[in-house]
């Protein structure tokens, strides 16, 4: 280990930055956030430093560097574009046993600045030891996505509860289980974010007083249309906290690779016209796992409330008194259209969008007359096997045969395939495609040649 990671208490302690440009300004922000009593020395300063000085937030010393500026300092930063001056600052600090950071010169520095994820009081620092700042930044960005923005408020509140929790729960195991419940409780986090004292008190009392072997909960999570990058941050957080993940065929392998490693995985894949696991059995799986006290994630492709039967599953849980929540996902219509260069609405071509299930059941005739109207976009989910019927019905109700259509297979994935044509060709086009596919019908499809960005990558 070349560097020891430490967190310094700098509040009301003298610190010095030598340099008055943009780089020095970024370092100054960090020290000001930490409450340091900051002096900045340079021949000239960018306007931000002047504004801070006018507000009484720091002291400016205009002129050449004077080593006496270090006499009362706990920490120094050399942030000029003059390598010789930076080296002089570093040597003067070293002689006084003051830690000094030299920007872009880690070998000349006695400490380096990490990439920081700030969820105060929770802090995470990432460093590559100065060898690859870009790598450290990328890791920080990834960690940022994993740590909810409200986490700091929850951590601060947990500190206030420590005494009571110690009195309430006799063993370390009981306390650990309580803290695990508290840190994943979305209602408490939201209440803290909203400063809703009544809800904070109610939720805290419920968590403290309920038995530790309480029933579990189910979180319905939309996995998006395929590209793992389209999974929401909250969806990612939920699948990494799950004890059990119940997932279907439309959830990509890339997304399943993000699931917590020791979570149980239950596959309940479905295909149009055939159910690997009957819906009622899926409902019972969710119920059974939650009743064991487990945190269950029901992971569905797209958005669970758009042709995902999410409402049916939640009704079962509601009737059994099982707590549940929902994390929306990007629905296939949005993802597939965007990755195909087809805007669902357009000022000149479509003022509305219809999302329609392609599972056309006997006795469930659609309103084809309204669907055939102009100035709208039709998106058929699971309509591949019914493409010829869709073509026939729309033409019978006076939709022009030259109306542009597109079929998107494996939308947003690297294996995405799109074919387009006209309504009179829809049935034949569908024979060339495989499930999962989405059918888009409307004038907006004509913009695909101009706006198709994804296939050009």
UniProtKB/Swiss-Prot annotation:
Catalytic center at which residues? 248 (proton acceptor), 270 (proton donor)
Q: Where is this region: Uroporphyrinogen-III C-methyltransferase?
A: 216-457
Residue positions binding S-adenosyl-L-methionine: 225, 301-303, 306, 331-332, 382, 411
The biological process GO terms on file are: cobalamin biosynthetic process; methylation; siroheme biosynthetic process
* E.C. numbers: 2.1.1.107, 1.3.1.76, 4.99.1.4
Q: Does the keyword Methyltransferase apply?
A: yes
One annotated GO molecular function is: NAD binding
Keywords on this record?
Answer: Cobalamin biosynthesis, Lyase, Methyltransferase, Multifunctional enzyme, NAD, Oxidoreductase, Phosphoprotein, Porphyrin biosynthesis, S-adenosyl-L-methionine, Transferase
Q: What reaction gets catalysed by this protein?
A: uroporphyrinogen III + 2 S-adenosyl-L-methionine = precorrin-2 + 2 S-adenosyl-L-homocysteine + H(+); precorrin-2 + NAD(+) = sirohydrochlorin + NADH + 2 H(+); siroheme + 2 H(+) = sirohydrochlorin + Fe(2+)
User: Per the similarity annotation, which family is this?
Assistant: In the N-terminal section; belongs to the precorrin-2 dehydrogenase / sirohydrochlorin ferrochelatase family. In the C-terminal section; belongs to the precorrin methyltransferase family.
Q: What is this protein called?
A: Siroheme synthase
Origin organism is: Shigella dysenteriae serotype 1 (strain Sd197)
């Amino acid at each position: 280990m070349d560097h020891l990671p430490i967190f310094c208490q700098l509040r009301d302690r003298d610190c010095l930055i030598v340099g008055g440009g943009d780089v020095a300004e970024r370092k100054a922000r960090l020290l000001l956030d930490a409450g340091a009593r900051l002096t900045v020395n340079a021949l000239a300063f960018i306007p931000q430093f002047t504004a801070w000085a006018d507000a009484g937030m720091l002291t400016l010393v205009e002129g050449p560097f004077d080593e006496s500026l270090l006499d009362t300092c706990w920490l120094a930063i050399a942030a000029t574009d003059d390598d010789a001056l930076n080296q002089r600052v570093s040597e003067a600090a070293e002689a006084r046993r003051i830690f000094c950071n030299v920007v872009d010169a880690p070998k000349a520095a006695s400490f380096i600045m990490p990439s920081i994820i700030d969820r105060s009081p929770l802090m995470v620092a990432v460093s590559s030891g100065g060898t690859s700042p870009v790598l450290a930044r990328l890791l920080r960005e990834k960690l940022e996505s994993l740590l909810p923005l409200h986490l700091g408020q929850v951590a601060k509140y947990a500190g206030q509860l420590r005494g009571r929790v110690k009195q309430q729960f006799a063993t370390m195991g009981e306390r650990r289980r309580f803290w695990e419940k508290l840190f994943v409780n979305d209602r408490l986090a939201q209440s803290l974010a909203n400063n809703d004292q009544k809800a904070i008190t109610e939720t805290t009392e419920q968590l403290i007083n309920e038995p530790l072997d309480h029933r579990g909960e189910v979180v319905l999570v939309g996995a998006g249309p395929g590209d793992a990058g389209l999974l929401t941050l909250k969806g990612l957080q939920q699948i990494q906290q799950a004890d059990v993940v119940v997932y279907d065929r439309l959830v990509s392998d890339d997304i399943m690779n993000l699931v917590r490693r020791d979570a149980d995985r239950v596959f309940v894949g479905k295909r149009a016209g055939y159910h690997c696991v009957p819906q009622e059995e899926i409902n019972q799986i969710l119920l059974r796992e939650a009743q064991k006290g487990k945190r269950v994630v029901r992971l569905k492709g797209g958005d669970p409330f758009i042709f995902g039967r999410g409402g049916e599953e939640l009704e079962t849980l509601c009737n059994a008194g099982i707590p549940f929540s929902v994390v929306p996902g990007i629905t296939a219509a949005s993802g597939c259209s965007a990755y195909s260069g087809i805007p669902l609405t357009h000022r000149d071509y479509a003022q509305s969008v219809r999302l329609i299930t392609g599972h056309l059941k006997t006795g469930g005739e659609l309103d084809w007359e309204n669907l055939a109207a102009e100035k709208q976009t039709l998106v058929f989910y699971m309509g591949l096997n019914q493409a010829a019927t869709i073509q026939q019905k729309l033409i019978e109700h006076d939709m022009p045969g030259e109306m542009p259509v597109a079929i998107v297979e494996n939308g947003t994935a690297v294996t995405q395939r799109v074919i387009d044509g006209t309504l009179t060709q829809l049935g034949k086009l569908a024979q060339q495609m495989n499930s999962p596919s989405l059918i888009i019908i409307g004038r907006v499809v004509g913009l695909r040649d101009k706006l198709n960005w994804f296939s050009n990558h």
